[in-house]
Structure formats: structure tokens, C-alpha cells
Amino acid sequence: MGKMRVRFPTLVLVLGIVFLMAVSIGIAYGEKDVLKSHERPEEREQEEWQPRRQRPQSRREEREQEQEQGSPSYPRRQSGYERRQYHERSEQREEREQEQQQGSPSYSRRQRNPYHFSSQRFQTLYKNRNGKIRVLERFDQRTNRLENLQNYRIVEFQSKPNTLILPKHSDADYVLVVLNGRATITIVNPDRRQAYNLEYGDALRIPAGSTSYILNPDDNQKLRVVKLAIPINNPGYFYDFYPSSTKDQQSYFSGFSRNTLEATFNTRYEEIQRIILGNEDEQEYEEQRRGQEQSDQDEGVIVIVSKKQIQKLTKHAQSSSGKDKPSDSGPFNLRSNEPIYSNKYGNFYEITPDRNPQVQDLNISLTYIKINEGALLLPHYNSKAIYVVVVDEGEGNYELVGIRDQQRQQDEQEEKEEEVIRYSARLSEGDIFVIPAGYPISINASSNLRLLGFGINADENQRNFLAGSKDNVIRQLDRAVNELTFPGSAEDIERLIKNQQQSYFANGQPQQQQQQQSEKEGRRGRRGSSLPF
């Protein structure tokens, strides 16, 4: 019992010493952490970064990190959606600037313009030093208001002098128009081959499934062709099938099996590969021999053609029918007949389905409009046709009037209804815009403006002008109806309607601006006449 009494104080002493040691160790570690937290930021960041450098970040981790930081850690390529958003914001900014410059009040809701497609909205399909082929994005991608155009696409290709676009066929009907230079187009069918010479303003239909190739025989001018494509298999999508293999495109023969090819050509596969498909090893050797630069220039679907080959390809080609009755297969010129509307401010040419058998079954019309600098194509609308318009040359702007969706009106019953919407945009070469049926439109040319139009659902379409002395539907309203329709008196309405003596095209400057311009020129003339010399 005495021994237990002696050991108990000793045990308590030992436990106390252990407790003090534990507390001392905890304090020491705490001081170490405090010292570590006061290290230089560079050293701490470097220490924290070391483990991350052991493996590269994934694209997902990089995007998440950029979102957390608020800005990307390095410049990255914009996606197609981001580019579209950027262009839409640019167009909206241009519209606001345009309204401020014009100084006119806007009675329309502020909307982005889904009917205008800048030239930047084309997607390149093929490109090399000899030319390029590109296609406009689908019309219905931007708005469901253009759903009826989902099976129509715009294709453009450009090629340098003395070049050839290799033979191909497509699962789409084409209606093409030459907008610059000259072309020789050969269409091949099972029983015949026909070549046509096309010049500026000539149009031609290439039926779906027909093998064709396009030559630029000119020594100086570039060739520019715009095509309206109407896909057959899948609405809005079409494909080109090439018999030859290039760096841009595989031959459709390469899709068949070895046994099928040998049975088809009754020849060994090695021979077929050498003649048609091409041997990859030989192609690589040929590229090295000629040099990579020359290879990049010649390889592809657009190739250089010699003078001798051009003479053979153009020898038996037929030209446009001119003012004769259009044939079932040959080219026709959009300006071969007299314009349907014409005055000193512009000309309007049109080929309707009933006047040309090539576009009759497609229910398509073609228009070519020339608006002189400073002139205005008066407001009008189409009764049935939807027009896809290509800006061939020049600059200007247009105003398109639409109506707000009925669904939006229901959702906004408590708001003041502003049903009329004005879509406007500046136009430059290569732009595309759509004119829906029934939507009034006017086009103003700031320089000589040339427009090519494809009319969809064009049979029995009627163009109704809203101003001018001829074909003016407002002018045909009864006098009594005018009094009931407009706030002005019948006399005022009649005087206003008859005030515009021009038809179809007119001076784009308001009368007040014309008077101010005349007064400025008069004052300038008087000052000039008073000079001492």
C-alpha cells in the first residue's frame, strides 16, 4: 500500500510532462505555418503550381478555369456560335448608328435582322491557290421564320484564269449564274456530252445527278459563279461526288470493295489503284519531287489547265440563246430581254417560270436589278414569292417591314402593342438577304448597285408597289375607302399619292434634301462668279 502511494505522484508527474511536450509541439507547428504563410507570393505560387504541371490540363478544365478567372488564360479561337453572336451585335450597332444618322424616329421594335446574311457567313468547302468553293449557312438556322427555305442553299465559287473545277455530280439541282468573267460548263449524261459558253449574266440549270465540270478559259479575269442549290435526299444538305481523288476529296470509287472494283473494271486492283484511285506512296514521292509549294497549288478540286486543253474543251461549246426563245437545256441571259421596269434611276429584269422551261418545274424565277447611285427602288411587296437576293456589286441599304409574331402579342397583352417591325441593313458586295412574301421592302443605292435574285414559289407571283404612278395598289383604292382608312382628307391623300411622278425607281433623296442641295449649289455658283478672275 505504501508502494502505491509512492508511485501515484510519480505517474501524475510523468503525465504532466507528456502534456507539456504535446502543447510545445503544437505551438511549434503553428509558428511554422504562420511563417510559411508569410513567404513571398512567387514562391508560394510556384510551390502550389508544381503538382499541376505533372499532367496537362484537359480542354474542359481549361474552360472551367477560364470561367472562374473571368477571362481566358490564352487567346482561343472563337466558335461558330460566338462568331454569329459577334456579327449580330455588329449589325445591331450599325442599325442604331444608321437611325441616329438619319435622325428619323423608329416606330418599330428593335430586333436583330434574321433576313440579312453578310458575306462572312459563308463556310468554305474547298480552297487552294486556284480558287475556292463556299456555301452559305442554312437560312433556317437563324430563325424559324425561314423554315420554307430549309431546302434551298446558296453556293459560290471563284476560280483564277485558266483553271478547271474537276468533274463531279451532286444530289441537288443547281441554277447557276455567272457574275464575273467567262465560263465553259460541260454537262455529261449517259448518252451525250454538251458544253456551253457562259458570260456575265448567263444562267444555266444543272440537273441533280448530272456530272459536270466548269472551266475558266479567260486569260485575265477571275470567274465568279453563284448557284441556288435544291437538295434531293435530305432537306438543307447536299453532297458532291467526285470520281477522282485529291487532297480535298476522296473518289467515290474508293468506297467500293476490292472484289467489286476488280469485277467492275475486269482488271487487277493494283492497276485500278494506279490509274483511278492513285497510289499514296507515288503521290508522296511526286509531291516531294515537285516541291510542296507547287503541290499545294495544283492538288485539289480546282486545277490549272494548259492552253491546248482549253482549246479542246471550248471547241464545240454552245453560247447563250440571246433574245431567242430559251431552250430546254442551254444557257440563257438575264438581261437578254427588255426590262420589265425601267427609268433613268434603274432597270429591273425578270425571268419567270412560265417563260423558261429550265426553271418551270422548280417553280423559280430569276431577277437582275440595277439601281443607280442615289436612287431608290420604291416600296413594294411580292404576293407569293420568297426572294433570296445576292449583292453582285455596289453598296446601299434596305428596309424590310414585318409583323410581330402572334404568340408574342399574347404574351405581352399588358404592353403597348407595336406590331410593325422594321429590319434594315447596309449592303455590300457578297451579302445575301431574304425578302419574305408579303413583306414590303425598299432598297436605296449609295453607289451603283447590282442585285441578283432567286424567287422561290414564283409561279403567278405578283409584285405590288406602294408608291409611284404605275402598278401602285394604294392608288387603286376607292376615294371613300381612303377617307375611312387614313386620317387625312380624300383630297390630301390623293395629292400625296400623286406627288411621286416616277414609277418603280425614284430619287433616293427626300424633296427637302434635294431643295437644300440645290440651294447650296446655287450659293456656291454665286460665290464663284464674284471672284476677281
From Swiss-Prot:
Assembly, per entry: Multimers. Give rise to a complex array of processed forms, due to a large number of processing sites and changes in glycosylation.
Region called Disordered, residue ranges: 37-123, 315-337, 503-533
Intrachain S-S bonds: none
Keyword terms, alphabetized: Allergen, Glycoprotein, Seed storage protein, Signal, Storage protein
Protein's job: Seed storage protein. Accumulates during seed development and is hydrolyzed after germination to provide a carbon and nitrogen source for the developing seedling.
Residue intervals of the Cupin type-1 domain: 115-273, 332-494
Residues annotated as glycosylated: 363, 444
Positions annotated as propeptide: 31-108
Signal sequence residues: 1-30
Assigned protein family: Belongs to the 7S seed storage protein family.
Chain segments annotated as transmembrane: none
Name of this protein: Conglutin beta 2
Note: Conglutin beta is characterized by a broad microheterogeneity with almost a continuum of polypeptides ranging in molecular mass from 15 to 72 KDa. Blad, the major 20 KDa polypeptide, may be considered as a stable, intermediary product of conglutin beta catabolism. The initial characterization of blad was made on a seed storage protein extract containing both conglutin beta 1 and 2.
GO molecular function annotation: nutrient reservoir activity
Entry-linked InterPro entries: Cupin_1, RmlC-like_jellyroll, RmlC_Cupin_sf, Seed_Storage-Functional
Pfam families recorded: Cupin_1
Superkingdom of the organism of origin: Eukaryota
Biased composition (Basic and acidic residues): 37-51, 79-99
